[in-house]
Every structure is written in C-alpha cells, then in structure tokens.
Amino acid sequence: MLDSRLRGTRFVAHPTRSVLNSPAQTGMDFWSLNPYVGCEFGCTYCYARFAHRYAVERAHDQGRLTDEEFAEYRGAEGWEAFESRIFVKDELLAILDKDLRKVPLTETIVIGTATDPYQPAERIFRITRGVLERLSKCEGLSVGIITKSPLVARDADVLTRLAEKNDVEIYVSLITTDDYVIRALEARSPVPGARLRGLKRLTDAGLRAGLIVAPVLPGITDDYDHLRALFGAAREAGARFIHASPLRLYPGVRDRFLPVLTEHYPELSERYRTAYARASHAPRAYAQALTRRIQRLQREFGFQVNNGMRDRYLTRSRLVQLDLKVPEVSPA
C-alpha cells in the first residue's frame, strides 16, 4: 500500500511494462496514457468503472493485495473500489522514454482516457506533471489532456513549454453548471465553479483549452436552459472550443448509475432502465437532434461548429458516444 487519505482512499502500486497504448490496442485513432487506474472522482456514469476489476485481480495475483483486501475490493459493492482504491503507476516515468520511441512524430497522445490524470492522487505523486515535463522535450507531437480538475492549472508552466514545439489541447470535462446535478452524479468531483476557474487560468496563460460536455444526460442536462448556461460559462472562461456527446451506459456501470439516478430523478428511472436494458446506446434520431442543438448553441456563443475534441483524436469513440439509446427524450 503506497498511502491513504482521510476520505478512505488507498493507493496501491501498479507495476507495468508499458505505459502508452497504441491505436491498434485501443481501437482509437491516438495513443493513450493513463497515470492511474481508478479515479477518486468516482462519477456514477464513468465507462472506465467496469474495468477496475481487472486491476484488482492482477494486484491480488501478484501479491500486492491480501486475500482480505481482495475480498473487500470485490465485495457486494465492489464498484466502490474504483473511487477508493487507486492503483498508481509509480514506475511510469522510468518506462516512458522507451515507449515514446514507438510513437511516430506528428501522432497524437491523449492523457486521461480511462482515469482523471489530475485526481487527488496527482497532488501526492505528481506523475502527470512528470509526463508533461518529459513530453516537453519532444517536438511535433499532438497532446490532449482530459480532466475534471482545476489542478491542471498548476501545470500551466510546463504546458506552455510543451506547446512551444507541440500541438497541445486541454479538455476540461464539465456536464453542467448546476451544482445539484454534480453533487448527485459526481459527488466526489470538483464543483463547476472551480473547474471553470481552472479553465480560465489556462486560457489566460495562452493555452488552447475548452470544455468537453460528456455525457449529456437525457432529460437532465440536455435542455436549452442547462446547455445555454454551460455555453455561457465556457465563453466567460475563455474556452476556445466546446464539444458535447450523449450518455453511454455499459452493463458494468448500470449497477452504480441507475440506483443514484432513481434516488435523485425517480421520474426518469423507468425510462433509463428500459432504454438501457439491452443496449448501451440511444437512437440515432436522438443523437442527431442533440447534435443540431449543440451546433445551434455553438453558433450562438461564437464557438466553431463541431470543434472540440478533434476528429482525428476521437473519431471512433465519438461515433460510439453519439449512438446512445434513450427513447422519449428528443431535443429539438
């Protein structure tokens, strides 16, 4: 065990032989890097939650977890381990140089596709900052960072150096400016105001940063009032772009998300349960209608239409996200 925190979070060393996942491995059009496994923010809808069991099993098999710890992590509510048992790739920086030799210049590396690289663990271990410092010695790369945390602004200095010879974009993840929604569905994550202040610090430093609104939640955050407030806040924070896509709800995530949804939005419970009973995605008609709504707001607030996470970054994952099944919710 590496360390623990007052909220009950424990940190476990996570040895690894490779830290960069290639496009062939991920099925996406970029290389990915995740400094941690699991995420203390613990968003109820997070698609990475279901994979945490594999890290737990591996740690047990390698003797890094006792039988008692393994039983605790894989218990009846084993999904809690995702946000309270964080696996730390503490040897990542020693391996990164070797892995970088495999990445052709002009290709893209996205940091934080299956964890938040600026979750509270980063204040202790500073692995993400170390990655950026190493990447700042490169030239010709495209680097994307996805985070919900204002801690990213701590690294404005190294991000500025990185951007001198590389293409850098920071995607601040925020689904709404409504504190109630955030506390209901992202109870351990930073409040909207803190994220927006972090975004402003980045844009004030001259960095290319904006919002990623993912997921848009049918019947909760997809109405004009929610979206207009969010777009306006992004504009005030100097966002250079805003990208949005609807919810995808995989089977391994439903057991965590649906009870919370029922508690806070009982009127939507049956609709979601029916919609996601057999599939993780919603009808194309909903996705297309939502896209039109987003494009209208992009024009209204002066953002480039369809800008945000570039097509070459997330082509396949965007297609997945834009195909979610939530009938009876139809933005116009």
Model-derived regions, located:
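Amphipathic alpha-helical segments that form well-ordered structural scaffolds
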Residues: 95, 134, 201, 289, ...
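Conserved Radical SAM active-site core
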Residues: 2-36, 40-171, 175-183, 192, ...
